[in-house]
Amino acid sequence: MTHWEFKGRELVNCTCEYGCNCQFNALPDKGHCHPVAGIHIDEGHHGDTRLDGLKIAAIFKWPGAIHEGNGEAIAFVDERADDAQREALLKIMTGQDTDPFATMFAVYASTVTNMHAPVFTDIDFEVDVEGRRGRLSIADYVEMTGEPIRNKVSGEESRAQIVLPAGFEYAVADIGSASSRSTGPVEVEFRDSYGQFANLHLNSHGVVRS
């Protein structure tokens, strides 16, 4: 198994309300799970292949809860990646070179039965985790925006976090509001729903905890 590790930042938007039951081992509140995710790798490697500064994204659709399977997915890889980097990123994203179920990549890959061909393209993605703002734009495929949750009375920004001491994706996530719309082989659309902003530190064995 080739060892990999990276630090980065993510924005994830799904169909759930702001709390996202899935983070607490409960069933999705809409009965299905349709997420869009973008990740900026600040620094990382897969074996001797550097991954610094590259971006990846994905769209998923599960007809029920994630663990029930039968998912559909499409992966997007930064067109700036060379052949070695593309191969490395796809291995990470599909749960290869990873302990069983140690990362969200490995968990999700095990529940997807219809994986579309990956797309190598320009990924316009930026995210401010602490500020709870971000956007993802992939031409002809997907648009996602994220912002802070607003207090329903005062209109002021509201901040909440989810802490998962034994999670497989992040240690702490800031929660905001996000909206997504996609076209192409995996179509989703939802507004003002669960937005997950997180700093990531992952490797072949799972979340790296200090």
Spans of model-derived segments:
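Short, surface-exposed loop and linker segments with low hydrophobicity and enrichment for Pro/Ser/Thr
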Residues: 23-32, 64-69, 119-137, 178-182
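Short acidic, gly/pro-rich beta-turn/loop elements at beta-sheet edges
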Residues: 26, 47-49, 85, 146-148, ...
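Charged linear interaction tracts used for macromolecular binding and regulation
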Residues: 71, 75-156, 160
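N-terminal ordered "arm"
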Residues: 2-46
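Low-complexity, flexible helical/coil segments
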Residues: 48-55, 75, 109-115, 163, ...
